Regions:
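Short, glycine/polar-rich helix-capping loops at beta-to-alpha or helix-loop-helix junctions
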Residues: 25, 89-94, 172-174
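Catalytic core of membrane glycerolipid acyltransferases/transacylases, capturing the structured
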Residues: 50-111
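Non-catalytic C-terminal accessory region of glycerolipid acyltransferases
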Residues: 2-14, 50, 115-224
Length: 224
């Protein structure tokens, strides 16, 4: 009799030896992160202020390599998972650091497969928080580029909300890092039961427009 294949456990756990190294690094290092970046968070309405519970995909603009650390300092009560581009990895040790210390998953920026998207959606479905940068590259000027559809596809397959985030790159180290967290964006409600490329593109465009709105809120906050 053939052995039943054991399904992987993607369920989020409050405590797990799997995440022990990450948790130690996070709680030892977040004080330095708070002091260095000094995040000042603004919310787009009361709904955006609610705690991020259960499965969710965070969609953020991408201004520097430090973005994952900035986001982690913004919402300390959750374990964040990120993606790392395989072309950035030079050796096995780097790969181990990304996977075990930063809880990141490898992805090919030139050809992300549907299999990868399916895995990520299953991981999110287990109650995890995945952060993505849908611009697909770093934009140091803070101007938000068009969004690719990967974040929306993962959120759709996981039936998870997208939490839009905008953060402004500070000009000087003594400035605070300004961050705006938006209302949950429910992809399933936007697209409906039947997924198509056109509907995915429309939803990506709508999410991009909302990100521009968050950028405007951030700029207004800076002027105050």
């Amino acid at each position: 009799m053939a052995k039943k294949e054991k399904k992987p456990d993607y369920k989020a756990h409050l405590f797990s030896f799997k995440y022990l190294l990450f948790d130690i690094v996070k709680w030892l290092g977040f004080w330095q992160g708070l002091i260095w970046w000094r995040p000042k968070v603004k919310y787009d309405g009361e709904e955006a202020k609610k705690k991020i519970k259960g499965k969710a995909v965070v969609s953020s603009n991408h201004v520097s390599f430090a973005d994952p650390f900035v986001l982690q300092c913004t919402v300390l009560y959750r374990r964040w998972h990120f993606l790392f581009m395989t072309d950035l990895i030079k050796n096995k040790f780097q790969k181990w650091i990304y996977k075990n210390v930063f809880l990141s998953f490898p992805i090919d920026r030139n050809a992300p497969s549907f299999k990868t998207m399916k895995f990520l959606s299953e991981y999110v479905k287990g109650g995890n928080l995945l952060a993505l940068f849908p611009e697909g590259h770093i934009k140091r000027d803070g101007v938000v580029d068009d969004f690719k559809g990967g974040a929306l596809l993962i959120a759709y397959l996981a039936d998870a909300p997208i939490i839009p985030v905008y953060h402004k790159k500070r000009k000087n180290p003594w400035h605070m890092t300004r961050i705006v967290i938006g209302k949950p964006f429910h992809v399933k409600d936007k697209i409906g039961p039947v997924l198509s490329q056109d509907k995915l593109n429309e939803a990506a465009k709508e999410l991009h427009e909302y990100e521009l709105h968050l950028q405007q809120l951030c700029e207004e906050d800076v002027k105050k």
